[in-house]
Curated annotation (Swiss-Prot):
The lineage of its organism: Eukaryota, Viridiplantae, Streptophyta, Embryophyta, Tracheophyta. It catalyses: ATP-dependent breakage, passage and rejoining of double-stranded DNA. One of its GO terms (molecular function) is DNA topoisomerase type II (double strand cut, ATP-hydrolyzing) activity. GO terms for biological process: DNA topological change. The gene is GYRA. It comes from Oryza sativa subsp. japonica (Rice). This is Probable DNA gyrase subunit A, chloroplastic/mitochondrial.
Length: 939
């Protein structure tokens, strides 16, 4: 049972224990009872209950039948080497030893010099080989062999990959090795074999890590290498926090580290703040170093993740590639997204392939072509967009679905005092400052001891030179070297070293000039000793020296920041945040093509002109609907089958007037033969708002607007239809609003919306109007409650005040009739005659106008008429005469060969009329002059 319990113990718990420390885990594991195992002679195990506490232990079975026979075959010698040990204890200790070996010896960097052992060994081996920045390159294979043979007894591929990475400018913010040859690329191309590539130390390595000063005895500790044949440094005396300068990453047992690189100039500045004020707040440090600085540049979005990483050691830094928008075709307004920088550790070729795959899968829309034009001058990935595609939307989708936006998960774990520890920014900086103080103190003590020793010798030489004749006489009077040394010591009170140095002086140094040099040297040594003593006794001087050395590096090697930090509250940018909420025109055709254009596409024209074409229409296609909305609006698409779909207005590609539009089947999940008959823009799904729906056969119903706030991509049912009927008109309304209905024969019913009971989506509704044979519904419009004072009974008093009902016949004739000319009538009635039409003519649309008035009390609205051939005319409503219910009306648009009026829409007037472009001017010149007096034909 103990054996199985030990084997079932999870490895992380076995490693760390309930308290989270290695020592606690070892103590907890040692208290467990487990099996006794004999190794390595055990081949089979059996259980017995011979232990005193009744627990079952595992004992070895004898290989033979007789123990004596086994002993006769050498079993006794083997048995002497069998060491009984508890299985759980051996497993725990062995696993902990392995884990700590990986943690301390391979995977994690030291917080003091910021290097892993393999990096440190490579750099030290290259320095021993004399591969300075001004020396010739040497083969990488030779460096790898040197490292493997002397310091790092592991695989050659691991050493070579580390060497290659230290030479890649897209992996290291400040490369430590200069590479000559193929050292890989940002496209993850592998480097050439080590027998082909060459390397040497980079000039920055000597200054950042102060590797030249490593031979100053006592500055850092040296430890034996793996075979005790020589020694290697346990640390390099780094002058700047190399852990933050180039960052680090590694995976160990039970933990990992991932530290981003930073800018040298900012790092020195933040080090200065930390030295001058150890109690500085994190915000003060962020003012000097706002965040990481990645070698590949890009943009860092937001600083919340940076703040968390610097505070706790863990955080998520969101990165984006650097992009530009270029126009590739001015005439067609086609543009392209140019990727100039990618996020750190992003494979460019994989990114390009992924974008192409998403375009094929139709996850990314609006992209027509993608190609990589990168060369030695820099990165350039061109993403060409389709005509009418919004670059901001496409770019936002690229951020959302590809590695063009990725995150760097900071996990700042490093070795501190022989143990792995998660540290924040202040703790890392403080650990480096303490280490650097120790290095400077040890260096100063070493130099002090050398200066004192040299001064002692120089003082003895000066004494000898001052008594040169006596010295010569003593030397000549002795028979050997030892007697001369003893005589000098006895005569002048010299030490052994002083006497030995005096005896070693050559004759040419006995001149007076040489004596002066020794005197000056003694004086210089005295000053140096004084400075070193002062340095060792004053901590502030040590801090000043640390800062001075770091500042020298900043002045010599600092470069501008590559990664731009963009302030943002959220890294998830919604399309609405980047798209301006502008007024737009949506044009829907009968065959299911939709276009989005700016309102100024159609300039104001006079009543009675031909108009301007809405654009190129496909064969046998006509304009079905024409609305005005905002780009942020939800657009509800109602089909003839009573199904409603939803999409934002900006999802429709913006196009020119001459474009044919975008098929709705590319935007909506329409079934075969399904047509969109009405589109309704919604900016907010209010609880007191409703949608009124009207079918061709005259059925009407009211549904709460919020019933359509969540529409799935496949659509939902909006109304139940009888066979042969279809949904045609949908409008927004409130309870107190009026709804005006008109049939093709000109019959009108005006009633309040509160007379309609709110129904669910899956209902048919009630009959709105009794239609005569051959008659169908022609239009529906809503009159806001704040804009009407309509009496409930008919008044014979002629009142021409607004609002008015604007009637538009399909032959291009229209009129305005005061709303007061109608009385409120119930639904399911024949209605009142609103427009008496000739036999070959029918009513095309009815609008309620007069909501926006000028100073003189006239309408400030405009109406856009669209013919079956696609011709559009935009005119002022005030130019349309006010007539009685029985009058024929005036000419609004001369159709000629344009067919009949297909649809009409009201838009708000601009504050200033825009000047007509040459094209519209030519169209107007072809039209007949507007009549000075409106022709009216009485009924």
């Amino acid at each position: 049972m103990a054996l199985s319990a030990a084997l079932r113990l999870p490895l992380p718990r076995l490693l760390w224990g309930p308290t989270g420390s290695l020592l606690a885990a070892a103590a907890a594991a040692s208290r467990r009872r487990a099996a006794v195992v004999a190794v390595p002679a055990v081949r089979f195990l059996s259980s017995s209950s011979s232990s005193s506490d009744g627990s079952r232990s595992v004992q070895p079975l004898r290989a033979g039948r007789d123990e004596r026979a086994a002993a006769g075959e050498g079993g006794a010698a083997v048995k002497e080497r069998v060491v009984p040990v508890e299985l759980h204890k051996e497993a725990t200790e062995a696993y902990m030893a392995y884990a700590m070996s990986v943690l301390l010896g391979r995977a994690l960097p030291d917080v003091r010099d910021g290097l892993k052992p393999v990096h440190r060994r490579i750099l030290y081996a290259m320095h021993e080989m004399g591969l300075a920045s001004r020396r010739p390159f040497r083969k990488c294979a030779r460096v790898v062999g040197e490292v493997l043979g002397k310091f790092h007894p592991h695989g050659d591929s691991a050493v070579y990959e580390t060497l290659v990475r230290m030479a890649q400018d897209f992996s290291m913010r400040y490369p430590l090795v200069q590479g000559h040859g193929n050292f890989g690329s940002i496209d993850a191309d592998p480097p050439a074999a080590m027998r082909y590539t060459e390397c040497r130390l980079d000039v920055g390595c000597f200054f950042f890590l102060d590797i030249d000063a490593i031979f100053i005895i006592g500055q850092v500790d040296f430890v034996p290498n793996f075979d005790n044949s020589q020694k290697e440094p346990s640390l390099l005396p780094a002058r700047v926090p190399s852990l933050l300068l180039n960052g680090s990453s590694g995976i160990a047992v039970g933990m990992a580290t991932n530290i981003p690189p930073h800018n040298l100039g900012e790092l020195v500045d933040v080090l200065s703040v930390m030295i001058e004020n150890p109690e500085a707040t994190l915000q003060e440090l962020l003012e000097c170093m706002p965040g990481p600085d990645f070698p590949t540049g890009g943009t860092i979005v937001g600083n919340q993740g940076i703040l968390e990483a610097y505070k706790t050691g863990r955080g998520r830094v969101v990165m984006r590639g650097k992009t530009d928008i270029e126009t590739i075709d001015v005439k067609s307004k086609r543009s392209a997204i140019i990727i100039k920088e990618v996020p750190y550790q992003t494979n460019k070729s994989t990114l390009v392939e992924r974008i192409a795959e998403l375009v094929e899968e139709k996850v990314l829309e609006g992209i027509s072509d993608i190609r990589d034009e990168s060369d030695r001058s820099g990165m350039r990935v061109v993403i060409e967009l389709k005509r009418g595609a919004d670059p901001a939307i496409v770019l936002n989708n690229l951020y959302r679905h590809t590695a063009l936006q990725s995150s760097f998960s900071c996990n700042m774990v490093a070795i501190l005092d022989g143990q792995p520890k998660l540290m924040g920014l202040k703790e890392i900086l403080q650990a480096f400052i303490d280490f650097r103080c120790s290095v400077i103190e040890r260096r100063a003590r070493f130099k002090l001891s050398q200066a004192l020793e040299r001064k002692h010798i120089v003082e003895g030489i000066v004494i000898g030179l001052d008594n040169l004749d006596s010295v010569i006489q003593i030397i000549r009077g002795t028979s050997n070297h030892a007697m001369a040394r003893e005589s000098l010591i006895k005569e002048f009170g010299l030490s052994d070293k002083q006497a030995e140095a005096l005896l070693d002086i050559t004759l040419r140094k006995l001149t007076s000039l040489e004596r002066k040099k020794f005197v000056d040297e003694a004086k210089s040594l005295s000053e140096e000793i004084s400075k070193l003593n002062e340095l060792l006794s004053n901590k502030k001087l040590i801090f000043q020296l640390i800062l001075q050395e770091a500042t020298d590096l900043k002045n010599k090697f600092a470069t501008p920041r590559r990664s731009f930090i963009e302030d943002s509250a959220s890294t998830e940018v919604d399309d609405l945040d980047i798209i301006p909420n502008e007024e737009m025109l949506l044009i829907l055709s009968e065959k299911g093509y939709v276009k989005r254009m700016k309102p100024n596409t159609f300039n104001l024209q006079n009543r009675g002109t031909i108009g301007k074409s809405v654009g190129k229409m496909r064969m046998n296609d006509n304009t079905s609907d024409f609305i005005v909305c905002q780009t942020h609006d939800h657009v509800l698409y109602f089909s003839d089958k009573g199904i409603v779909y939803s999409a934002r207005a900006y999802k429709i590609p913006e196009c020119t007037r001459a474009a044919t539009g975008t098929p709705l089947v590319q935007l909506l999940s329409l079934s075969d033969g399904e047509r969109i008959t009405s589109i309704v823009p919604v900016n907010e799904f209010g609880e007191d708002q409703y949608l009124v729906m009207l079918t061709v056969n005259g059925y009407i119903k009211k549904v709460p607007l919020n019933a359509f706030s969540a529409i799935r991509t496949s659509g939902i049912i909006s109304i139940q239809l009888a066979p042969g009927d279809e949904l045609k008109w949908v409008r927004r309304c409130g309870d107190d609003d009026l709804v005006a209905l008109a049939s093709q024969n000109g019959m009108v019913i005006v009633n309040t919306c509160n007379k309609l009971r709110a129904l669910g989506r899956k209902t048919r509704g009630v009959l709105a109007m009794k239609l005569k044979e051959g008659d169908k519904m022609a239009s529906m419009d809503i009159i806001p409650a704040t804009s009407h004072n309509m009496p409930e009974t008919y008044s014979r008093v002629r009142d021409l005040s607004p609002p008015w009902l604007l009637f538009i016949a399909d032959n291009g004739i229209g009129k305005r009739v005061p709303l007061n000319a109608f009385r409120q009538g119930n639904f399911n009635r024949v209605g009142l005659q609103g427009y008496k039409l000739p036999p070959d003519c029918s009513l095309a649309a009815v609008f309620v106008v007069g909501f926006s008035l000028t100073d003189d009390g006239e309408s400030d609205e405009q109406v856009v008429l669209v013919s079956q051939s696609g011709t559009v005319n935009r005119i002022k409503v005030k130019d349309i005469s006010i007539r009685s219910r029985s009058a024929r009306g005036v000419i609004l648009m001369r159709l000629e060969h344009a067919g009949k009026i297909q649809s009409a829409s009201l838009i708000s007037a601009a504050e200033e009329e825009e000047e007509q472009d040459p094209e519209s001017a030519s169209l107007i010149s072809e039209a007949e002059e507007p009549e000075k007096q409106d022709p009216e034909v009485s009924a």
